[in-house]
Amino acid sequence: MNKRIYLCLAHMSGKEQMYIKEAFDTNWVVPLGPNVNGFEKDLEEFVGEDKHVVALSAGTAAVHLALLACGVKPGDEVLVQSFTFCASSHPITYLGATPVFVDSEVDTWNMDPALLEEAIKDRIEKTGKTPKAIVPVALYGMPYKVDEIMAVADRYGIPVIEDAAEGFGSRYDGRMLGTFGKYGVLSFNGNKMITTSGGGALICPDGEAKREIMFYATCSTSIFRQSFQSL
């Protein structure tokens, strides 16, 4: 069989050029503006659960800023799924922390809850420290074992950053992926369920968390912190 099966092909609705022209015509060629704000609101309505969403430059940036907001620092360890794209783990190293890879289970090909708990116990025994975060992935859009992973995370008080970059629109028990953990990562790269050519977003638990992420995403400038107080 020689036919290539693509992960996902970009679908154009016909309105993309209109919105690009609108951005140029109104001189909103900087990173933020009405279209970005409207996109964030649409995403918040779509994912539900009273979540707040920040549009970012990439899904990788969303992982990076979520780790930063969870307090990951040099010398820390973060548990991450082993079967995933490298962007799930690279941001851990950006912060000087160490990724600890957890293997998959056979049902979903995602993080194995039993191996996750073994890894937590192992790292506590060997380092005397609890890992700072857990990054399960919705590989190919397949939900990971949410209930079991969250139960393990709760037992050890470790925040979960859901990498739902490939799982936008997927639901578990009627609820959108990316809304179960403390943060949820989305990607709009060209091979994802919807695309902005590049780009991503971070699902945040509340408005305060959203403002913190936006502060980091805008070079930590005080003018943006003041501008976003009303969000």
Residue ranges and their predicted role:
Residues 74, 80, 101, 160-162, ...:
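Hydrophobic residues in well-ordered beta-strands that form the structural core
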Residues 21, 25, 40-44, 64, ...:
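Solvent-exposed, non-membrane alpha-helical residues enriched in polar/charged side chains
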Residues 96:
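Structured binding elements
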Residues 107-196, 201-209:
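Active-site phosphate-binding strand-loop segment of PLP-dependent enzymes
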Residues 84-89:
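Conserved coil-to-alpha-helix start sites within the AMP-binding
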Residues 32-77, 91-93, 101-103, 126, ...:
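Phosphate-binding glycine-rich loop
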Residues 17-24, 208-216, 224-231:
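Structural motif of enzymes handling amino- and sulfur-group chemistry
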Residues 1-30:
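N-terminal "arm"/small-domain region of PLP-dependent enzymes with the aminotransferase-like
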